[in-house]
């Protein structure tokens, strides 16, 4: 970024930015960059060079003599209106001694005469230093195997990092160079202002090409780049005391011994060990310690299977006897609820002390084998913790840490979706630490077949994150990098990437044979020393510890593992161990399976609703609302005041508002949710003159809760996962994710299948997340018609074969894995949303809603429906005794769910049919067995029962409802042998017809079938 416009240099405002003027003439100007003299915009105008130029310019402003004479002339020329930008930069004559094929800039009027050899050398050394800053990581010794990274036959040393490139020879190595801007300025201390060329190169090699390499020059912020240089471009970036080395050794010993112990005791079990990357454990523990020192109170970790058990044991502090009991199989007891999961998927929540004496809450979220799917869940949990701690401004008290595999980080799209939350106002977590456990292989696939970039971490350049590559065999370098990443995140509240390059001792799991596919790689691995052996030899050789001391410590650690192994056979795991988040005062899943909890009321006093109506229909004085929206808002207020004609959006707003007044936080998220895809919600008002915003519900006076509504990025997988994670943190959050159209929710199918449907049964992970899914066949084609109701119902855990006992009926909601509803009235929507929060447990809710019913006259409620009663599982026909006969006169009963009711109502009205009644099933799962049985018994003279749906036969509710309907009929007084007749669209591969005319023809056909029209 070029920032040359200032009060001191106002001339740049009239001439345009320096970068702009140079770009215009780039085709004709030959420019000397920081390495290669080129024609055009190759080097001089790149982002990284711009930062360098900015640095030179600021130094020149303070003291023109502090920069090279060529820079002094250049900046003077740019300040001179008589000299065109194309002539501003003039290279000294002797700079032309560049490698063949390059060309120096032509001389102009700005500089005349000769420049001595020292000037040329100084400028070339500046270019050399910059080349190390930009490309030094390509030469760094970050690969312990020497096969993928660093300089080797496949990756030759970049020419810009060689002395020959600048025309230097061995005779130049002893020449003294002035230190200053562009040449190791932080080494100019203690009276030392010069250094030989050899010393400079040696320092550059140590700083940028040792066991770690840093990519940061892609970051446009000079402040951030300078901050990093202050920490890595210094004589000794890190030096550890004896006590610090003892701590590193101890942590590495525990990590290494853990894998060795499991390998000895359970040689044939899968554990997805961390061998070859054990230094990650002391790295993470350093990250935890430093972050806590800087104010972090909660750390949420997400990772896949590789090394998970080691992290659980050594970082989160899960008892080793608990882990060993899982290997033995002794934890599969009758008193442990849920189906459980394999040991390398389980999560944990634990509070433990750190080296500073402060405590930290560590949470490792449970995860499936769908790699990276836990990433957005972790960030959602972290954001919710920041909210709970009233820290959404500073974002210092909670931290998300994600561990990725190298293949998954580069290959899984949800990684990018998750990183995209970084600066979004309602999704930012103040920066995430990403740790790539890079074993240079993905199952059996080499990196060259798994990604199109040199590093797996290159994706992170999109968010201007620094990328630290570090050799896993150098545990001190690893520890330094993790510490640096913690400080970066605290300072700048942005992401940092740590790419720990190591190897994988075994195959994908311990029973796999990797030499089938990577024979040469595994020959190298067979010769590798373990990380702890490398570090032990270093400590012994430098005299820090004796071999005897180290061996005794290893033995002590091993004996502690043996003790835990003995205790494992009698170990009884506590319920709290598995919980990702502990909800104090809430019933556990085990208690829900045995107790019957009362149904709490969801109705609200009329006075409260009318006060809310005033809030919803007003705005600040001087705020200019769109003229069309004024009418809509006033009608909302009027409907509440008169108590009649309350529409869908108003019913929803009343639910949100009353929950906030009850002390429940409400968060609504998704694409375009502020206005609503169908222009129905208008939760956020925009001033038509200033574009200032006003959110009526956020003005409600309750210190305990607030209302948040946020348009999300155009992502389903990432955002749904984020909101799921948000919902895990506290039961006092109503979190609702809304799809733009229900059809697009399946982009997040992994979150639905692996987390929402099975999270509680597998991991005791409780959530009250609401999925709001627009659904309904309106002739808009196969991409805008269906939220895939059938898929949610297929995931339902209820047994359709048996009518529930009385006890089971009372506990239906407690036993279900999630709920599926398709309400048709604003009042029922109001009660279902309030019911989510007004009970002593939480269950996810798939809430299907009709686009057509948002404004339909048949979808209106009166205020009394909000002040009395509650959610209705089924709604009987309100036309009995009006436009149709009584229940006794009814011959045909049509069961249905959702907006097909409006088409049926219209057809019945046109036919003048008096003997057909409709019964709307508002809640599909748990199924209303008892309510439906009682309703059927109230119709004494039915001749047929029909199920009608607008979806095709192989979609919608039919496959789910058919067995349950027949189970229910067997419990009725008169209809035990009845068969329900299906009326709906024929089976189809596509969701819906693409043309309106075909849509209407299909609808007409099944409506005729319902009423037996010829």
Curated annotation (Swiss-Prot):
Pfam families: 2-oxogl_dehyd_N, E1_dh, OxoGdeHyase_C, Transket_pyr. SUPFAM superfamilies: Thiamin diphosphate-binding fold (THDP-binding). Residues 1-30 form a transit peptide. Keywords: Magnesium, Metal-binding, Mitochondrion, Mitochondrion nucleoid, Oxidoreductase, Thiamine pyrophosphate, Transit peptide, Tricarboxylic acid cycle. It is found in: Mitochondrion; Mitochondrion matrix; Mitochondrion matrix, Mitochondrion nucleoid. GO terms for biological process: 2-oxoglutarate metabolic process; cellular respiration; tricarboxylic acid cycle. InterPro entries: 2-oxogl_dehyd_N (IPR032106), 2oxoglutarate_DH_E1 (IPR011603), DH_E1 (IPR001017), KGD_C_sf (IPR042179), ODO-1/KGD_C (IPR031717), THDP-binding (IPR029061), Transketolase-like_Pyr-bd (IPR005475). Coiled coil: none annotated. It is an enzyme of class 1 (oxidoreductase). Thiamine diphosphate binds at residues 306, 406, 439, 441. It catalyses: N(6)-[(R)-lipoyl]-L-lysyl-[protein] + 2-oxoglutarate + H(+) = N(6)-[(R)-S(8)-succinyldihydrolipoyl]-L-lysyl-[protein] + CO2. Gene3D superfamilies: 3.40.50.12470, 3.40.50.970, Multifunctional 2-oxoglutarate metabolism enzyme, C-terminal domain, TPP helical domain. Mg(2+) binds at residues 406, 439, 441. Its cofactor is thiamine diphosphate; Mg(2+). Its EC number is 1.2.4.2. CDD domains: TPP_E1_OGDC_like (cd02016). GO terms for molecular function: metal ion binding; oxoglutarate dehydrogenase (succinyl-transferring) activity; thiamine pyrophosphate binding. It comes from the Eukaryota. One of its GO terms (cellular component) is oxoglutarate dehydrogenase complex. The 2-oxoglutarate dehydrogenase complex catalyzes the overall conversion of 2-oxoglutarate to succinyl-CoA and CO(2). It contains multiple copies of three enzymatic components: 2-oxoglutarate dehydrogenase (E1), dihydrolipoamide succinyltransferase (E2) and lipoamide dehydrogenase (E3). Present with 14300 molecules/cell in log phase SD medium. Belongs to the alpha-ketoglutarate dehydrogenase family. Component of the 2-oxoglutarate dehydrogenase complex (OGDC), also called alpha-ketoglutarate dehydrogenase (KGDH) complex. The copmplex is composed of the catalytic subunits OGDH (2-oxoglutarate dehydrogenase KGD1; also called E1 subunit), DLST (dihydrolipoamide succinyltransferase KGD2; also called E2 subunit) and DLD (dihydrolipoamide dehydrogenase LPD1; also called E3 subunit), and the assembly factor KGD4. This is 2-oxoglutarate dehydrogenase, mitochondrial. It comes from Saccharomyces cerevisiae (strain ATCC 204508 / S288c) (Baker's yeast).
